[in-house]
């Protein structure tokens, strides 16, 4: 087993390593986002190298990290993380609006995203949100909360990654799937107990929540908890 205790650099973020490894042969350590959050793990590379990852606890792997480089053979072991797609919300339209409207919209957008427990990074007048549910669900959240005037699209994680710093990339893509899927889709124009879509996934504390929404204004919930 080859022990990896330090990250040498990042071929996608560091111009020095990008130049240094130009023409090198890459042996990839392929990880999903959950695996990338572990500071300690053992896994084989695509070329069969048995790698033991033992990093400091506050260090997580990012796509493009260089784990080892053999100058004689010109072979580098590179981390490849399968990135999620990203919802990109364009905030530039808000610059045309009054300061009061801009503040109100940004506050409401932040509240809506936070209410879903969605990670987000704001940069270059855009908000990047990694997908944790279907695009149709995220589309519904945006539209039913009244953000139709904000252009948004869905992009590949690999398209967004070069726009981010290392810390931003780790925040956006690090363990996005571990966040609770906690989706509420209900129009603010609906009646207080109007029909809406409420999806609660299994939370990290081990409970699952199932709500039977037959509202007759008694607000009865059939709660089923798995201990």
UniProtKB/Swiss-Prot annotation:
Residues 209-221 have a biased composition (Basic and acidic residues). SUPFAM superfamilies: Urease metallochaperone UreE, N-terminal domain. It comes from the Bacteria. Its main location: cytoplasm. GO terms for molecular function: nickel cation binding; unfolded protein binding. The keyword 4Fe-4S does not apply. Keywords: Chaperone, Cytoplasm, Nickel, Nickel insertion. Coiled coil: none annotated. Residues 192-227 are annotated as: Disordered. Pfam families: UreE_N. GO terms for cellular component: cytoplasm. It is found in: Cytoplasm. Disulfide bonds: none annotated. The keyword Nucleotidyltransferase does not apply. InterPro entries: UreE, UreE_N, UreE_N_sf. Involved in urease metallocenter assembly. Binds nickel. Probably functions as a nickel donor during metallocenter assembly. Belongs to the UreE family. This is Urease accessory protein UreE. It comes from Yersinia bercovieri. The gene is ureE.
């Amino acid at each position: 087993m080859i022990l990896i205790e330090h990250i040498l650099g990042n071929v996608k973020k560091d111009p020095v390593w990008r130049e240094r490894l130009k023409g090198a042969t890459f042996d990839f350590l392929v990880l999903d986002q959950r695996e990338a959050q572990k500071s300690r793990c053992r896994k084989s590379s695509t070329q069969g190298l048995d790698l033991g990852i033992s990093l400091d606890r506050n260090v997580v792997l990012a796509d493009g990290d260089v784990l080892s480089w053999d100058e004689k053979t010109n072979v580098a072991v590179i981390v490849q993380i399968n990135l999620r797609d990203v919802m990109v919300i364009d905030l530039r339209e808000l610059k045309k609006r009054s300061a009061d409207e801009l503040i109100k919209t940004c506050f409401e957008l932040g509240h809506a995203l936070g209410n879903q427990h969605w990670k987000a990074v704001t940069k270059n007048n855009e908000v990047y949100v990694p997908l944790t549910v279907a695009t149709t669900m995220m589309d519904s959240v945006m539209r039913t909360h009244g953000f139709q005037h904000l252009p948004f699209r869905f992009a590949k994680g690999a398209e967004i990654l070069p726009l981010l710093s290392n810390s931003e990339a780790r925040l956006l893509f690090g363990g996005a799937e571990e966040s609770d899927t906690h989706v509420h889709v209900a129009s603010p124009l609906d009646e207080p107990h109007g029909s809406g879509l409420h999806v609660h996934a299994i939370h990290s504390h081990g409970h699952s929540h199932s709500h039977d929404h037959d509202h007759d204004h008694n607000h009865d919930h059939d709660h089923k908890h798995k201990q």
